[in-house]
């Protein structure tokens, strides 16, 4: 039972690791002894986080556009120039689009689906050889897909493609979880509720909306970095080695209270 929750010495990739939930997870990984690669399209934000995280451990930044296979292939080649295996892949990079149903544009559907659903699938496919090399029966490699409570319950905003992509990602997690287990790779998902991030900044800036959201959360607050980091650490440690194809909701009880 000793060191059951340790992730020290592992190597991880966190996509979208320069902000929001991705940055929260990446920072926790670095602080807990994980060699962590973070990716983002935005070089300045990426370098800022790399500099901050590197004060506590090893963090490498790679600028990447993962909306298509060209960017995924480029990232894979660069990672392979450093690593022969990977222990953890966090599919966190994502985007959203809000518009009324009557005016919702095709580009708002395609862009969100490409980044939120297609990218995790093809990233996992591409990195399969490196994940297989690392996986052991008693401590499998891990793929963690960052979903959302919006993929489970009715969203507050008209984010049709976002909620659909996250719902599909939850089912993809179940599918891949069952299929990848034979390779000693555990695939799970985290469905966060409301955390401080760029995507939820409109809530934080609106006092009335913020109060309305918190009123719906039994634990009367927004999520903290420790809340999401603790879940990610658990899912990447030996403590979760028999957890596969599952989605853990981290929302302060919001879905439970909704009935």
What are these regions (language model features)?
Residues 124, 165, 173:
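Active-site helix of classical SDR
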Residues 100-101, 105-113, 213:
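Substrate-binding pocket helix/loop in short-chain dehydrogenase/reductase
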Residues 11, 18-19:
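Conserved glycine-rich cofactor-binding loop
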Residues 2-4, 233, 244-259:
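Short C-terminal tail/terminal secondary-structure segment
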Residues 129, 178-179, 241:
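Alpha-helical segment proximal to the catalytic Tyr-Lys
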Residues 148:
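Residue(s) in the substrate-gating loop at a strand-loop-helix junction
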Residues 181, 186, 243-245:
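Short, small/polar-rich loop/turn modules that mediate ligand/substrate recognition or access, typified
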